[in-house]
Every structure is written in C-alpha cells, then in structure tokens.
Amino acid sequence: MDYYRQYQLKNYNSFKTEALAKIFCQPKSTDELRKCLADYPNEKKLIIGGGCNLFFTKDFDGLVICPDIKGLREISDEEEEDEDIFLEVNASENWDEFVDYCVERGFAGLENLSLIPGTVGAAPIQNIGAYGAEVKDVIREVVAMDLETNEVVSFANNECEFGYRDSIFKRTCKYFIISVIFHLKRTFVYTPRYFDLNKELEDIEEPSIQDVRNAVIRVRQRKLPDEKVLPNTGSFFKNPYITRDHADLIIAEYPDLPAYPQKGGLVKTSAAFLIDKAGYKGKRIGNIGTYPNQPLIIVNYGSANGKDIVRFMQEIQQAVKDEFNIELEPEVRIY
C-alpha cells in the first residue's frame, strides 16, 4: 500500500472542490487499514467513500483514507425462513450496482433506493432514504473497525442508533465500516408509499420489482442532475421537523405547504418547498446555484473553492429563516 503526500482531493468529492490531503492512502483489506492506522497513529483521520455527500473548503491536515475493500456474499441463517435472504456486502462496493444485483435476482427491499450515488459503506452512515424507504429498514448488522482500538466490532440494527439521515457512525466518526449485512425478501409486492412513484407506476396493474427500479430511475433522472455533468451532492439540506402550531402559521399563508405528521406531535415539511418560496429555486450566484428542477440540490457550475458553496448555502439558510423562521440543516458533510 502506497502513501501519497499533498494529494489532490478534487476527484474524491462530487462537488469537485479542490483541497490537498496531507497524507492519502487506499487500503484494500482490513489488514492494510490496520497498517495505515498504525503507521500514522497521531494524525487526524478522515475516511471517505464515493465522496457523494461531502465537500472540502480547505486542505485536510491529516490522513485521508479512501478504502477499496470489495466483495459480496450470500449468507445462510437456519433460524430464518426460506423467504429471507441475507447478503454481506463490503463497504467499497458501488451502491447502485448492488441494488441492481438484488433487483435482477428478485431480492426485495432496496428497489426504492435505486440510483443513489455512493458506496455501500456510506449507506448506514447517512441512513440513506428515498421514495418512502430508508436503508435502516433492511440492515441487519454493520461490521466496523473501531478507529481508537483497531478492533472489529459488530452493530445490530438497534445499536446503530438510526435516525433521519443519521446514525451512530455519523455522529461519532470513530468507526470504519467494513461491511453491511442486509436482510431482504425473495418475493415482492409493490406497496404504494410515495406520490411521484405511484404516479409513475399508475399504468401498471401489478408492478414488478424491476418496474419499480425503472420507475425510480426515471423519476430521479428527470428531477436530479447527473453529478458527472453538474457537480452536486444530491439533497443538500435535511427536511425540517417543526411543531404543529408552526406548520399551521405557515399554512395560513402557504396552504400547499407539505406537512406530514410525525411521532411526538411534530410535522415534517419540505426543504425544497421552503427554498422555492424563499426565492431560491433555480437561482444562481456566480458559479453556484440551485438546480432548476429541484431547489433542494445545490450545483457547482465551475468553482473549485468550497467556500463559494458555503456562502451560497448560508444565503439560502438566511432567506428561509427570514421567511419561515426555520433553520435548514445541511445533510452534507463540510470540511
């Protein structure tokens, strides 16, 4: 395994912002990972996957680890029924290629998460979700290395502390995910859960798992920019949770506010709606703007400086705060 000094990270974040890593390496096994941790015990560490949910505003003064640990295997569990299928997938496998693998074999549970960029290892960190599904619903176990002790530890689903775009791995930043064990089903029945997807499938009486994947891909491609053409990180902000009273105040002026009741009396609303009504749909300042088809996505039209993105982000946050008294929280990681 080689180490690189002052390594350019532009190709390791989907916003394509420039930054140098003091040290960079790509371990291909857990043994190589242990070696790089042992070789640089006192360096600050950052583990990155596909770089689809982060960007850089400055150089990283430490060790950047971009693992290349791949592999997939089916595992058996005598206590489970024949309906169940378990797959252990290593962290560096491409997420959408894995979803395609499952759909081709009729393994149900991931089809709504089609075309999400990134790696398998990033999925539980962010608890990725789309079209009424979250990855936490199909994760049985996460195998990780504790970066402080170099020990391999396993987390059952309930130990991962999954939340909305959140997990113990995201909050603590002290674990390197080695693999994820998924619990899927061998049979599939479509359950309507999301308006756009339901509408896309309305002419199909009994959608197959492949029909659902194809529909998700079509909807995403219409709404979302290709990061290879227009650098972006997908949804930039989390959808906010507000009180019922707060929602009612907004609805008095904006009757079409999306409002989804949640446990504890809160209401989940749409960050895209708020950004749109605050005047930032399709808005561009210099080389940074929101995507015209989806204001939740910030796109980079040509800046190499991550601070340009931060300034634009802060403008949106202030506009939404002024109009709705809601503070938008970034979904992406900013370094």
What function would you assign to each model-found segment?
Residues 4, 10-17, 54, 152-299, ...:
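Phosphate/pyrophosphate- and phosphate-bearing ligand-binding catalytic cores of soluble enzymes
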